[in-house]
Amino acid sequence: MKGPQLDYADLSWSDNGAPISNAYGDIYFSKESGPEETDYVFLTGNRLRERFSNAPPGSLFTIAETGFGSGLNFLMAWALWRECGPADGHLHFTSVEFCPLAREDLVRCHQAWPQLAEFARQLRAQYPAPMQGVHRCRFVDQGVTLTLYLGDVVDWLSDCSFKADAWFLDGFSPKQNPEMWSESLFPLIASHAAQGCTVATFSAAGFIRRGLKEHGFNVSKAPGFGYKRDMTVGVFQAEEPNQPAALPHKEAVVIGSGLSGANVAYALATRGWKVTVLEAADRIAPEASGNPQGALYIKPGVEWSINTRIHANAFLYAERFYSEIANLPTPIWNPCGVLQLAHNDKEAVRQQKFFQHNRYPDEVIRPFTHQEASELAGVSLPASAMYLPGGGWLIPPQLCAHMLQHPNIEVRLNSPVTALERTDEGGWLIHIGSGESAQELECAILILATANNQAMQPAAASALPLKPIRGQVTTLQVESAALPQLNTVLCGEGYLMPPIADRLVTGATFKPNCADAQVTEADNNANLEQLLQLTPALRDELSKHPPTLQGRASVRSALPDYLPAIGPLIPGQGGKGLLIVTAMGSKGLALAPLAGELVADMLEGTPAPIEDSLVQRVLPNRFSQE
């Protein structure tokens, strides 16, 4: 059996309450002086108080770490950033952990540091499931991002692109953990170091100092903490400076106010960018993102394939993201879980193979019997199911409107883009409207984030093999006597949402290569029949109390590999200022938050929310390379 699940760290606890790794025979931190040691070795060793205090307004600082463990180093860096870093700056902390701590062990560790309690609480709220790969956690109102890779350190650094301003070399001692402290580690650290990057580690082992020195670090010994005689500090001085290109002026224009556009605008705005959003219609999210309810779910493949990895990563980030930003007085996010029914023999066999061949954490996905699924849903169901506890439903247009209310975002409605023109300076001139109302807007960074805008796109976008997909959802106005007390989202051939007041939303039809957005009675009836296939017990009630049906049709776009297009539209530096986010298909609620993060990371040079090998599979130019 394979699949993405990792084993939790096997711990025991010393008499004074310090966690000990049974696999490595070493402690995670000293119960008496853990924060003090972190402050001395990593914060002072990298001169972070001085550097944070002197950082200019709006600046970005990236810290990379080996050995996340209990998160102590991250929490201490976060606390220091909030104390003396620029209020409008952004701290990006990236780390790796091969054996993640179980949540209950994390809680026990954090109880030792009451001074970090509020930061620790926020970390635990977004702490990821033990699944291999990259996990993104955003603490938006803190100006802090955590990008945590669960897996092997060499695998991580061989498949990501960033330049750190400071390195924390932590983890268990080299004697107990020689696999991590291998010779292959040091060139990877150097390749992920900005000019002037500092490094600090508790160890003064000769091979560590030599490895760092051989790959561009000026290293020296420093007095160690407590009983340790020495530690190592250093500064990176590459023979050929490998600094990333300077950040652009932090202003951008986004075309489109649906899920893709709103998420891109929000990701940039929360990093201090000024964003203008152009929307052709007179309202936000006028197309598919305007549906009255939408489900957050994915359908993972039997194999741990590229598509499954991307969708799983996006789903897990979306779950954390919505839980953080959509906690409003009138909730727009309901994390009620999703049941994917084995609605026919083919799907039943597929689900059986899935669970036979894969290990997933129960908190991500697990099998439910027919009886278990019915008890959870609150209605009688016809089949067993896959259960996604982190799924749920949202109100997409309200979600888009909420994100676009950020003070760094200006939304211009009734602003149809008619043409794009390259300027002599390498930017873009946007032509808006026509006749007397025509306007022009110039920008250096432009992101196209609509499903159907080929008419105004450059030739490179028109060359994308996008196909339209028509979908119609149906809202049923149901008498209270017939309204099911549905507790969770149901998926099969279609989906059914838990009711809002006296309304049920179900859908959606799926018609590839059809761009007709007219509502049809036939599609409403098809959606009703799909609903009754999901919940046959409703047939009698709805026949006694016939519902009123109201449809809403829209057109999405997709690509042949059913992955989105995210990133520079024109490869190379010449196309750096023009990006596209499109082809979300029917998974916009799962994919769009990750897409927004990825675009922001591409523009700022920060660690991406997925591995580089996966980034390559969503770049728009992947079809021109085939």
From Swiss-Prot:
It is found in: Cytoplasm. GO terms for biological process: methylation; tRNA wobble uridine modification. Coiled coil: none annotated. Its cofactor is FAD. Residues 1-237 are annotated as: tRNA (mnm(5)s(2)U34)-methyltransferase. It catalyses: 5-aminomethyl-2-thiouridine(34) in tRNA + S-adenosyl-L-methionine = 5-methylaminomethyl-2-thiouridine(34) in tRNA + S-adenosyl-L-homocysteine + H(+). Gene3D superfamilies: D-Amino Acid Oxidase, subunit A, domain 2, FAD/NAD(P)-binding domain, Vaccinia Virus protein VP39. Pfam families: DAO (PF01266), Methyltransf_30 (PF05430). Its EC number is 2.1.1.61, 1.5.-.-. InterPro entries: FAD-dep_OxRdtase, FAD/NAD-bd_sf, MnmC-like_methylTransf, SAM-dependent_MTases_sf, tRNA_MAMT_biosynth_bifunc_MnmC, tRNA_MNMC2, tRNA_S-uridine_synth_MnmC_C. Its main location: cytoplasm. One of its GO terms (cellular component) is cytoplasm. Keywords: Cytoplasm, FAD, Flavoprotein, Methyltransferase, Multifunctional enzyme, Oxidoreductase, S-adenosyl-L-methionine, Transferase, tRNA processing. GO terms for molecular function: flavin adenine dinucleotide binding; oxidoreductase activity, acting on the CH-NH group of donors; tRNA (5-methylaminomethyl-2-thiouridylate)(34)-methyltransferase activity. It comes from the Bacteria. Residues 255-626 are annotated as: FAD-dependent cmnm(5)s(2)U34 oxidoreductase. In the N-terminal section; belongs to the methyltransferase superfamily. tRNA (mnm(5)s(2)U34)-methyltransferase family. NCBIfam families: MnmC_Cterm (TIGR03197), PRK01747.1-2 (NF002481), tRNA_MNMC2 (NF033855). Catalyzes the last two steps in the biosynthesis of 5-methylaminomethyl-2-thiouridine (mnm(5)s(2)U) at the wobble position (U34) in tRNA. Catalyzes the FAD-dependent demodification of cmnm(5)s(2)U34 to nm(5)s(2)U34, followed by the transfer of a methyl group from S-adenosyl-L-methionine to nm(5)s(2)U34, to form mnm(5)s(2)U34. This is tRNA 5-methylaminomethyl-2-thiouridine biosynthesis bifunctional protein MnmC.
